[in-house]
Regions:
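Long beta-strand-rich cores associated with HINT superfamily self-processing modules
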Residues: 95, 108-215
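A glycine-rich, hydrophobic loop/mini-helix early in the fold
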Residues: 55, 60-101
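Terminal, regulation- and interaction-focused segments at domain boundaries
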Residues: 101-107
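Generic solvent-exposed, charged/amphipathic alpha-helical segments
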Residues: 42, 46, 50, 79, ...
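Solvent-exposed loop and beta-edge segments used for protein-protein assembly and interaction
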Residues: 41, 98-100, 143
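Glycine-rich, low-complexity intrinsically disordered segments
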Residues: 14, 33-37, 64-68, 94-95, ...
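Generic alpha-helical secondary structure
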Residues: 34, 38, 42, 75, ...
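An acidic, glycine-/histidine-flanked metal-binding catalytic module
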Residues: 2-42, 46-55, 166-223
Length: 223
């Protein structure tokens, strides 16, 4: 069998866990080179967001960003996603088709801050918007709200410029509170979710939407 995405076809067949895969990957130079691109893309995006945050703070005397959290998809998650989609397990295929290897979650103070930051990023001439999914204006049936952007931005190395995809999730504190606890209830407990609990979760999502609306109204009254 030909070498797979991480040179780990045999390892994957043996069912090695993610930590064991990481140890093997630490010796795989090609993997390290590719992941460096995604790590640097995260740093570049975080730097742009920090600049926007500081500029907004200077102009409006408050920060639109409460916190940021970045992550790289694990090797096993990447491989599983590619296998489910029937993709060839090699680096060019991975880079052309898997757009969420690098991800940033941005927690904002108010709903209007989410759209402000999204617009600022979209207005930057060297950023390409791959996809945009507005689950704030159009929440998912379960009540989930967030703004998802998949972008491609340039990363400058010593001898080359590479445009790397990054997934961005922008949401308010209330949206993140609901999404985090809903995920814990739905997935971490590994228990079936009945219709009554689904209804309760949706009602909580509706309440969080009301909180965002009321807080934004208060902000405008006081400013």
């Amino acid at each position: 069998m030909s070498e797979n995405l991480f040179g780990l076809t045999v390892a994957a067949d043996k069912g090695l866990d993610d930590l064991q895969c990481q140890r093997l990957l630490s010796e795989n130079r090609r993997y390290q080179e590719v992941m460096l691109q995604y790590r640097c893309a995260l740093k570049a995006l975080e730097s742009r967001l920090e600049i926007l945050n500081e500029e907004f703070s200077l102009q409006h005397d408050r920060n639109p960003i409460e916190s940021m959290k970045s992550r790289l998809k694990s090797p096993s998650s990447i491989m599983n996603k590619m296998q489910k989609r029937g993709l060839s397990l090699d680096f060019p295929t991975m880079q052309a088709n898997i757009m969420d290897i690098a991800g940033v979650r941005v927690i904002c103070s108010f709903e209007e801050d989410v759209f402000f930051l999204a617009k600022c990023l979209k207005d930057q001439s060297d950023i390409e918007i791959i996809t945009e999914k507005d689950y704030i204006s159009h929440p998912k049936p379960n009540g989930y709200r967030s703004l998802h952007l998949t972008i491609r931005l340039p990363v400058f190395f010593a001898e080359k410029e590479i445009h790397v995809p990054v997934e961005i999730q922008l949401r308010t504190i209330a949206m993140d509170f609901w999404a985090s606890l809903e995920h814990t209830i739905r997935y971490k407990k590994n228990l079936p979710i009945n219709a009554e609990i689904e209804t309760e979760l949706k009602e909580c999502a509706d309440s969080s939407r009301e909180w965002d609306s009321k807080m934004e109204q208060l902000l405008h009254i006081l400013t």
